[in-house]
Each structure stands twice: as structure tokens, then as C-alpha cells.
Amino acid sequence: MTNIRKTHPLLKIINSSFVDLPAPSSLSSWWNFGSLLGVCLGVQILTGLFLAMHYTSDTATAFNSVTHICRDVNYGWLLRYLHANGASMFFICLYLHVGRGLYYGSYTYSETWNIGILLLFAVMATAFMGYVLPWGQMSFWGATVITNLLSAIPYIGTDLVQWIWGGFSVDKATLTRFFAFHFLFPFIVTALVMVHLLFLHETGSNNPTGIPSDPDMIPFHPYYTIKDILGFLVMLTALATLVLFSPDLLGDPDNYIPANPLMTPPHIKPEWYFLFAYAILRSIPNKLGGVLALVMSILILAIVPILHMSKQRSMMFRPLSQCLFWLLVAVLFTLTWIGGQPVEHPYIIIGQMASVLYFLIILFLMPMISLVENYLLKW
């Protein structure tokens, strides 16, 4: 008799995606982050759902409702900090996942890559709106500053900002709609994840060598299910450690002060995972130029496949490209640090140099060094 998992209309989809899926035999731990992102999304949706049961999206009560969750709801503090730090784990896994794609040339699967970029934007939008909901000082001023950037769009900018705000400033209407969208977006992300996987399974996984692995495939289960479960345990242990020992390590103390439109915090900055983009935004003195640079800092990923000049797919056997890749990582760490610093000397010039270097590496140095490597290998 044929196994039910191979015949049942629903089970056979799951079977072909997670059980009998042929996978390259050489996948390293860098291929764990896709499944880790799935776990992060699950944790965020579950904790978010329970938080939404107790949260009120009204300017008068939002801050107090979060305090109520932490103090009076059974394990409310755990839900709140799992959700807040779960977002940080989400972005750590996201950036490592994207970095893996850049290093091993996974971007040559253009459909999967482009859906991934769309997912990155969707998750960033969700996280930004979620940060506004506790209605602390940094929530309010972060929302004001970031939404205000849209006013840089010529002609329609001011009207667009007021339309998003639902008035002439960030107020009750803004908070209510941000809550509605923050609740909705994770489900859109889940749908996009399914499309992402659909396109991935059309081509099959890449592998560290970048060489087609068709002659050497192994079933996903049990080999990679076990490997993924180990990844889950490591990540959930890290998350539990963060939540139970220093839950406010990655947050901003200003967000424990209720939102006050009459008092600006000394340094307005977003959560740590947006600081690199924020540093690029601030490094350009022109408002519209800064906004364009901010968008391009992520959107530049979409043209990476076009800029691939190497005859080899992966960087595994390309030491010169590896040096540039790790320089890019160092630049991103520098930008993250600068984004959290005040706008004064010497941080301004460091931020500007790092921003220029970021675009220079991706747009010019990477393709040029690839051509040099091709020449050295007589290709």
C-alpha cells in the first residue's frame, strides 16, 4: 500500500517540501537560517496574538496597557519580552540569511531572491509599526521622524504624510492604523514565505561549492530535519537567555517614558536592526537624497544578480572576493555603530565614509574583483 503522506492532497505537499525533498549533501549550518526564520515568525505570531488580546490601541491607554500586560497578566512579561527580543532574533537570522545568499551566490535564483527582498521590506515595515505600539517616547518620535521622511517626495509628499498620520501629527488615528497593519502584516509575510519556498523548490537549494549537486542528493528527512532541530534549540536557548537575564539589553530606556509630543528625546534613533540604514540616511545632508539612499541601501540587493561577473557562483574558491565581502560586513557593523551615535564630529564623517564604501563595494569593487579573478584563472 502507498504511504498516505505520498497520496493525500495536503500531506503530499508537505511531504515534497519537508520529507522527501532532495537536498544537496554538502549544506553547512549557514543553510539553517531559513528554518530558523520560520520558527521566529511562528514565535512572533503566537506571542503577538496573545499580546493583542490585552493591548489597547488608544493614545490615552496604550502605554498603560503594556504596563498592565507586564505587571498583571499571567506571564505577560514573558510574552512581551519574547516578542520584543524575538524581533531582534528575527533580524539577526534575516541578516545572516541574506549574507549567506550573497556569499554563496544564491541570488542567481532571481525569483527566490526577489521574493526574499520583498519579504525583507515587509518584515522591516512590520517591525517599525510594532515599535510604535508601546507609545513610549522613542515610539512616538521614531514614528514622527520616519513617517516625516515621506514628505521629501516631490509634490505629493506633505499630503502623503498627513494621509498616513490621519491628521496633522502622529496621534490616535496613527496608532490605531499602525496596530491594524502590525497585526495584518505577519500573515502577508507568511503568504510571501510560502511563495519564497515555492520558487526555491522549483530550482532546488544552492550549496556551499556553487556547483550543481544533482548527482549527489540526500532526502531532507531525517538528515536536515535533525540539523534544523539542533538549530532551533541553539536559537531558542539564546532567545531564552536574552529574555530571562537581560530583556532590555537591546531596547531603548527612553521607551519607558510615556509619549510626550512637547518633549523631544536627546537622541532619536530606531531599534538596533535599522541603525545601519539610519546611518546612511543621516550621512546625506539633503532630505530627498537621504531618503533615496535609505531605500537604495536595501533595494541595491535587487541588482546584485546583474552585477555578478564571476564565472564561479560561490565565493568559496574566490579569496579576493571573500576579502571584499568581509570588508562589507565590517562596513555594516560600522554603520550600525554610527547610527546609534549623536550627529557630531567625528561620527558624521565616519558615517559618510562608511556609506560611500558600502555602495562602492557592492556596485563597483565586487564586479571588478570578480573580473580580476576570472582573468587570474584564465577564464
From Swiss-Prot:
Biological process (GO) annotations held by this record are:
mitochondrial electron transport, ubiquinol to cytochrome c
Q: Where does heme b b566 bind?
A: H97, H196
Kindly list the GO molecular function terms attached to this UniProt entry: metal ion binding; ubiquinol-cytochrome-c reductase activity
Kindly give the Pfam families that the UniProt entry links to this protein. Answer: Cytochrom_B_C, Cytochrome_B
**Where does the chain bind heme b b562?**
H83, H182
Q: Which residues bind a ubiquinone?
A: H201
Q: Which GO terms describe its cellular component?
A: mitochondrial inner membrane; respiratory chain complex III
Keywords (A to Z) from UniProt:
Electron transport, Heme, Iron, Membrane, Metal-binding, Mitochondrion, Mitochondrion inner membrane, Respiratory chain, Transmembrane, Transmembrane helix, Transport, Ubiquinone
Q: Which residues cross the membrane?
A: 33-53, 77-98, 113-133, 178-198, 226-246, 288-308, 320-340, 347-367
Q: Which cofactor does it need?
A: heme b
Give the superkingdom in one word.
Eukaryota
Q: How does it sit in the membrane?
A: Multi-pass membrane protein
Which Gene3D superfamilies does this chain map to? Cytochrome Bc1 Complex, Chain C
**What family does this chain come from, according to its entry?**
Belongs to the cytochrome b family.
Q: What does this protein do?
A: Component of the ubiquinol-cytochrome c reductase complex (complex III or cytochrome b-c1 complex) that is part of the mitochondrial respiratory chain. The b-c1 complex mediates electron transfer from ubiquinol to cytochrome c. Contributes to the generation of a proton gradient across the mitochondrial membrane that is then used for ATP synthesis.
| Protein name as catalogued | Cytochrome b
Q: Which organism's genome codes for this protein?
A: Artibeus hirsutus
Please spell out the taxonomic lineage of the organism that makes this protein: Eukaryota, Metazoa, Chordata, Craniata, Vertebrata
